[in-house]
Amino acid sequence: MNRYFALCACAILGVATGSIGAQSPAAAQSAQSATAPAPPVGDQNRQYLFAPTGEQMPYRIYVPTSWDGESALPIVLFLHGAGANERTYLDQADGLVRMLAEQHGYIVVSPLGFRPLGAYGNPLRLPAVFGESAAAAAQRAAVTPARRRELALSELEVMTVLELVTERYGADRARTFLAGHSMGSGGAWHLAARYPERWRAVAPMSGPFVDAATYPFERIRDLPIFMTEGTGAEPSLSGSRALAEFMRNGDFRFEYLEVDGNHGSMVPMVWPRVFEFFDAVSADQPRNRP
């Protein structure tokens, strides 16, 4: 198993969840597939055994049908929003994400996140958008031990799926991208700061769940970020505009785009631009990845 991932798993669960085991299924998956034929391509609904809880966890992936079975493809970890699941966004707009993944040559991984409202480790939700520090503080104070455990498991679960698929398909660790919508956008901001060395770039969509008082901005200073929002997506719109101003004034590697859509309809509007952004970042000299 990748040493970097093992350390991440131990850090998450050892600190936040006490006695829960931190063993990843990625190593077992890798060993089992050592003599297996090339893994399948196309659209796939899959599941795996999540060792910390002993549960089968679903995830969905799309692998370009043009893959030759050997090339190290770039990979996108996408985090769904509240009320959705691992399947939802890959079906939107007649499968737009799948079409773009095929066209641009990316693997797309969409995990559940342990529970539908697991939130990938980020405890913030509406109205705690950027600039609403009082709401953020109140939400953090209200997190119970059970919820803290669920948040930690959600974070670990998506990182486990990413590692599993990366190993199985030999994906390019130097071109690993992170994106998410709404609750998933909050997860993207959270994971960007937790593992800044893991990502080539990040694309949060309509979910500025970032606490100005506590977020470790210096950890993402060198990370390219493309944030998108819909002009009809209040109350997240005001938070996104405030966060965009903060990022620009701070000279971060940051781009911001607003489209004429609401909180949900903006997603298919921005996906083509997100893949174009990832392509542009990929064309730069990549950083080393663990």
Q: Which functions belong to the PLM regions below?
A:
Residues N45-P58, E70-G170:
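Serine-hydrolase catalytic machinery in alpha/beta-hydrolase-like enzymes
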Residues A6-S19:
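Bacterial N-terminal signal peptides
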Residues A201-F275:
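The feature captures the conserved acid-bearing segment of alpha/beta-hydrolase catalytic domains
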Residues L73, D91, R148-L156, A193, ...:
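Soluble non-cytosolic domains of exported or imported proteins
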